[in-house]
From Swiss-Prot:
GO terms for biological process: cholesterol metabolic process; diacylglycerol catabolic process; ether lipid metabolic process; lipid catabolic process; protein phosphorylation; triglyceride catabolic process. This is Hormone-sensitive lipase. Residues 150-161, 237-246 have a biased composition (Low complexity). Its main location: membrane. Gene3D superfamilies: alpha/beta hydrolase. It is an enzyme of class 3 (hydrolase).
Length: 1076
């Protein structure tokens, strides 16, 4: 145990006494297995606890919960090869005697299981003192010669159940293969069986150390937790999408049908995957889903101290092993990595505990436990869980012939870097906690202090979050998509400056994406360079890829089929609207005028059924000539009556990208499920049309829709504004503008992950933008700067205008043919280069006996298997400077110690202040000492901790500090109370891991304090923009369905509710993986 850690009495982690007894499963109707009654004698013997320095025999630390955990190990773990299991034996002399005791106890437990639960427990309790005395008096036999009692235990079959009856819960309940347990036993030799039982000692020793931690958990929770943590068969990360066939998934995470009764939480029931026939007929998909859900809840409910101390215990064990492997470079690097993991975990635990202690003060209400502090703690716990799983895998397989040293070292280094940066973010959050007023999430202080805080924050290293650790905090089903997006992004960025368009860029990116797919470190460094240095025009071009005709057509083929999907062009003509206070009076609604003068507004009408008015001549005259007219593809159907409802939708895209076409797939589903026509506004985009052009167009289209709702197939009785991200911002501002004009306000608003604060203010959730692959901080700042009217570079090419359309086609064709040749050659050369390096390293002579594995030999080599010319050994600074050129063999190697990476000085970043003030601010900053910088990072960090700094100079990352960002029609959160009181009922659907989460929480808090009807639902483990990913996985579909339910509350309020609809419900959604 680490010095300074507290020792807690045994009563803190003993299983709960109120457990139902386990009854044998009978043939016929399926029954739910439950836990066995605890033996009072066993509990009494385990109540006493000695100091950690007194090493007791291993069996004296065993509990019934661990017997269950050990007895529920997968059969696949018992089928390991003899050589692999031999290496799993511990190196310490004391625990080598415990396998004998363990085998005898397991043999007696199997015999007792045939006599009944109560009798078996008594027999074990009576014989345990004698066994302990025998253990102390006589040394245990070596691993090669088992004692007679052990041989008898090995000769006993693993399962002696009657034919047709199910096995006892103490035996493995499921098999990972199609063969029966009897066949599996026949294929395993006696030597393998002996060594398999001996190999389980490592897991037993790990669980024994876990008992010394502060925990109070039931036996079933201990069993599920121990099986998840000790799953060393699969090398993939926790919850990875490739875990479908892993033993933890196929072997059953918990007993089928058992409710995990977490303290203070509602039970989570894992349904059985079979219907009374055979456990082998369950589908792997359902097992995979159950494993992910259970592992996710274990992460949520696992005690933070338990997780940290478990990780520290494993790290110390790995340090002791690799330190004894000689002076090899790889062994030293592995020892250094685990030392860093131990240091960062111990430093992070108290900081996370402090944040958790006050996080509830920033929630909307007790039923809605969501804010940036909680999200930051959850992200850190996810990183600790991944390191815990990876450390356990290394501890169990480090001497195996199949152990990939280089791969596991790279994984550990990446997650250690992520953990280090997360610790820095936690210290930032503590600084915000001290500075902000109680209950306020956004920093409120002097703008100079805010600038200094964000300038220091933006210089943190980010590449580690975009390589191997990409999206580790999100649901596993969405991580492959994020990897595809990141590879496409960095490949697209290489060809952005070449002024290519269309198919040429896509083809070039395809051929250059190979090296980024092979090398995650290079991909992360390039991702960081692009996000910090490329301007908003790049992001606009990249996000608009979904607007291509080919991609949009494919998306529409997979979406629901609707009768009406038309692109309309609203003429820029003023019209009158009646006032709500006095309908006899009217107000003139002028067409949009800002920046570019009067112009038409494009809207898309979507309706599942053809309704009255939608095929009128007046509406047909507004159809844009090149717009979709899906109505013409259908024979003229019978018209449906006008709907009572109308949905006005504003799409997202950061105010700079996308149109209604990108969001059409889920809008079609909305039209089908809600039975209401939808009108989606294609507002003008920044930077060509900054604020307030988009607001003017959206308000003009909203008023036009109210006045001409009959043409849209609606009576206009209920009108709902809906939008996501930037569209959510427009929902609030349009409603505020309607109230200011005195015209009809909508009946309700559904905003998904809206941006309500565009002012450059720090908040705990916005700290997550450091690692968010879809909404990095630099991208957020550039989008807001463009919408606020900041000057951007003009990338319009006069040569393209002179070429014309046919000239562009000919030029792109020539570039495409050239890229086919150069791209294929580059990709093949990079692949052959990496293969050649690997073959050269493998051909080096290994002066070791044949009994040693390749990994063992690599640990002892003076020059490890990762040569100094490998990309894995380059620092991220070297990778960024390397670019497309070749790196010489004398490139310095990657060292993940904080002392090596911290000296890199951050470059000055013009993040908040205008360009003319950046130089003076930088000079003043350099003159100040660390203690005089107020919110400076070095003053916020404890002594000895140094986060990693980015080597990329973010010279093009200004956030326009114009006073316009404080305009309530741009930042609704800053609106005065009188304006917020004019809003209709608001329904917000936010993401717990979204950098914009605090925007939603603070707006909901303000509306709640004003007595306004508001609901807040927070979905877990999903990124910003999940609506456009609705068809990707089950979690995104459930989140999209939640948005539909919120809209339905506006269109059809529940019976008994007033015109404001639902007023009090708020919470964190559990159907989408939320906290229960």
């Amino acid at each position: 145990m680490e010095p300074g850690s507290k020792s807690v009495s045994r009563s803190d982690w003993q299983p709960e006494p109120h457990q139902r007894p386990i009854t044998p499963l009978e043939p016929g109707p399926e029954k739910t297995p439950i836990a066995q009654p605890e033996s009072k004698t066993l509990q009494g013997s385990n109540t006493q606890q000695k100091p950690a320095s007194n090493q007791r025999p291993l069996t004296q630390q065993e509990t019934p919960a661990q017997h269950d955990a050990e007895s529920q190990k997968e059969p696949r773990a018992q089928q390991k090869s003899a050589s692999q299991e031999e290496f799993l034996a511990p190196q310490k002399p004391a625990p080598q005697q415990s396998p004998y005791i363990q085998r005898v106890l397991l043999t007696q437990q199997e015999a007792a299981s045939q006599q009944g639960p109560g009798l078996g427990k008594e027999s074990i309790t009576q014989q345990e003192p004698a066994l302990r005395q025998r253990h102390v008096a006589q040394p245990g036999p070596g691993p090669g010669e088992p004692p007679p009692a052990q041989q008898e235990a090995e000769s006993t079959p693993a399962a002696q159940a009657k034919p047709g009856a199910k096995r006892e819960p103490s035996a493995p309940t499921e098999s990972t293969s199609q063969e029966t347990p009897e066949q599996s036993d026949k294929q395993t030799t006696p030597v393998q069986g002996a060594k398999s039982k001996q190999g389980s000692l490592t897991e037993l020793g790990f669980l024994t150390k876990l008992q010394e931690l502060s925990i109070q958990r039931s036996a079933l929770e201990w069993k599920a937790l121990s099986e998840w943590v000790t799953d060393s068969e699969s090398e993939s990360d926790v919850g990875s999408s490739s875990d479908t066939d892993s033993p933890a998934t196929m072997g059953g995470m918990v007993a089928q049908g058992v409710k995990l009764g977490f303290k203070g939480k509602s039970g989570y029931k894992v349904m059985s995957g079979y219907s009374g026939t055979s456990p082998h007929e369950k589908t792997s998909a359902r097992n995979h889903r159950h494993y992910q859900d259970t592992a996710s809840r274990l992460i949520h409910n696992m005690d933070l101290r338990t997780m940290t101390q478990s990780l520290v215990t494993l790290a110390e064990d790995n340090i002791a092993f690799f330190s004894s492997q000689g002076p090899g470079e790889t062994a030293q690097r592995l020892s250094g990595v685990f030392a860093g993991v131990r240091e960062q975990a111990l430093g992070l635990e108290p900081a996370l505990g402090r944040l958790l202690g006050v996080a509830h003060l920033f929630d909307l209400d007790p039923e809605t436990p969501a804010n940036g502090y909680r999200s930051l703690v959850h992200t850190a716990r996810c990183c600790l869980a991944h390191l815990l799983h990876k450390s356990r895998y290394v501890a169990s397989n480090r001497r195996s012939i199949f152990f990939r040293t280089s791969h596991n070292l790279a994984e550990l280094e990446a997650y250690l870097a992520a953990l280090t940066q997360l610790r820095a973010l936690v210290y930032y959050a503590q600084r915000l906690l001290v500075t902000n007023r109680p209950g306020v999430l956004f920093f409120e202080g002097d703008e100079g202090l805010t600038a200094d805080f964000l300038r220091e924050y933006v210089t943190l290293h980010k590449g580690c979050f975009y390589g191997r650790c990409l999206g580790f905090q999100f649901t596993p089903a969405i991580r492959p998509f994020l990897q595809t997006i990141s590879i496409g992004l960095v490949s697209f960025g290489e060809h952005y400056k070449r002024n290519e368009t269309g198919l040429s860029v896509a083809a070039s990116s395809l051929f250059t994406s190979g090296r980024f797919a092979i090398d995650p470190e290079l991909r992360g460094a390039e991702f960081e360079r692009i996000t910090q240095n490329l301007d908003v025009h790049f992001w606009k071009a990249f996000w608009n890829i979904t607007e291509m005709e080919v991609l949009s057509s494919l998306a529409n083929m997979a979406s629901a089929t609707v009768r009406v999907s038309r692109l309309l062009s609203l003429p820029p003509e003023a019209f009158e609207m009646p006032l709500t206070a006095d309908p006899t009076l009217t107000v003139t609604i002028s067409p949009p005028l800002a920046h570019t003068g009067p112009g038409p507004v494009l809207v898309r009408l979507i309706s599942y059924d053809l309704r009255e008015g939608q095929d009128s001549e007046e509406l047909s005259s507004l159809i844009k000539s090149n717009g979709q007219r899906s109505l013409e593809l259908w024979p003229r159907p019978q018209q449906a009556p006008r709907s009572r409802s109308l949905i006005v939708h504003f799409h997202g895209g950061g105010f700079v990208a996308q149109t209604s076409r990108s969001h059409e797939p889920y809008l079609k589903s909305w039209a089908q499920e809600l039975g209401a026509p939808i009108i989606s506004i294609d507002y003008s985009l920044a930077p060509e049309a900054p604020f307030p052009r988009a607001l003017e167009e959206c308000f003009f289209a909203y008023c036009w829709a109210i006045k001409h709702c009959a043409l849209l197939g609606s009576t206009g009785e209920r009108i709902c504004l809906a939008g996501d991200s930037a569209g959510g911002n427009l929902c609030f501002t349009v409603a505020l503008r309607a109230a200011a004009y005195g015209v009809r306000v909508p009946d309700g608003i559904m905003a998904a992950y809206p941006a309500t604060m565009l002012q450059p203010a720090a908040s705990p959730s916005r700290l997550l933008s450091l690692m968010d692959p879809l909404l990095p901080l630099s991208v957020l700042s550039k989008c807001v700067s463009a919408y606020a009217g900041a000057k951007t570079e003009d990338h319009s090419n006069s040569d393209q205008k002179a070429l014309g359309m046919m000239g562009l086609v000919r030029r792109d064709t020539a570039l495409l043919l050239r890229d086919f040749r150069l791209g294929a050659s580059s990709w093949l050369n990079s692949f052959l280069e990496l293969s050649g390096r690997k073959s050269q390293k493998m051909s080096e002579p290994i002066a070791e006996p044949m009994r040693r594995s390749v990994s063992e030999a690599a640990l002892a080599q003076p020059q490890g298997p990762l040569g100094t010319d490998s990309l894995k050994n380059l620092t991220l600074r070297d990778l960024s400077l390397r670019g497309n050129s070749e790196t010489s063999s004398d490139t310095p190697e990657m060292s993940l110690s904080a002392e090596t990476l911290s000296p890199s000085t951050p470059s000055d970043v013009n993040f908040l202040l205008p360009p003319e003030d950046a130089g003076e601010e930088a000079e003043a900053k350099n003159e100040l000492s660390p203690m005089d910088r107020g919110l400076g990072v070095r003053a916020a960090f404890p002594e000895g901790f140094h986060p990693r700094r980015s080597s990329q100079g973010a010279t093009q990352m200004p956030l326009y500090s114009s006073p316009i960002v404080k305009n309530p029609f741009m930042s609704p959160l800053l609106a005065p109370d009188s304006m917020l009181k004019s809003l209709p009922p608001v329904h917000i659907v936010a993401c717990a891991l979204d950098p914009m989460l605090d925007d939603s929480v603070m707006l909901a808090r303000r509306l709640r304090n004003l007595g306004q009807p508001v609901t807040l639902r927070v979905v877990e483990d999903l990124p910003h923009g999940f609506l456009t990913l609705a068809a990707l996985c089950r979690e995104t579909r459930q989140a999209a369905e939640l948005c539909v339910e919120r809209i339905r509350l506006v269109l059809t309020p529940p019976a008994g509710a007033g015109p404001s609809g639902e007023t009090g419900a708020a919470g964190v959604d559990g159907g989408c993986g939320g906290r229960h």
